[in-house]
Amino acid sequence: MVTLWGNYEGISQHTVAASEGCSKGISDGWEDMSYRMSILPAESFFSNGVFLIEGPSEILFYHSLAKSLNIDLDYLNISLISVDGISFKIYAAILDALEIPWVMRTDNDISKLKGQEKWNFAGINRCLDIVGIKKFEHSDKKITSLDTLTNGDWQTVSEEINKSGVYLSKVDLETDLVEELSASILDALDKKDNQSAIEYLQKKKAIRMRILLKKIKKDLHNLNSGDLAKPLYHLVKIVKGE
């Protein structure tokens, strides 16, 4: 894979073969995810930076957020790639082989092990695995995403993984968005409390996210200093060489 590189203003361009011509690495990566080959991963090959996210709702949201924050994704040649919450590590490995910068944001999933009274820190461990840090042991007692906030686990993990461009939701996109932009969203959805707004958005996610974004478009810039915007700003800095 040969890539034409240039600085942020498009000058001082040069060509390089990523990973010294990493056909073996790319081949191995594609073999692992051959069942989901599509135009989306192909798009990432020609990007200056890639933002890996969960699904369609995140694609809609981050396109809208970037526009509200005056971040021109096309000019910066940044791609938003949905991995459907499954293949973050595989995508990351391919992008690393191509020497294409990336960041990611994933849900803080908690899952119960089948047939056992144990709970897996699925979201946390997904992140820790990607950055090469020892994963959490399963919990012997029932836990929730909110428990990882109150007991400090989310903060501790985030401080480590954010350095590598890996970001963990406090819960998920819908919950985090309502918590960061509560007043605007409650008014837009005509809901009385955050929980009812969250539950509404978690059903028919992409459809309702699209409708919501139209209603809160003028308020999205208020997310500029929150956790939702951090991975986007992180990738922009990398692409600009800052």
Predicted segments — roles?
Residues 1-242:
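Acidic, divalent-metal-binding catalytic cores of TOPRIM
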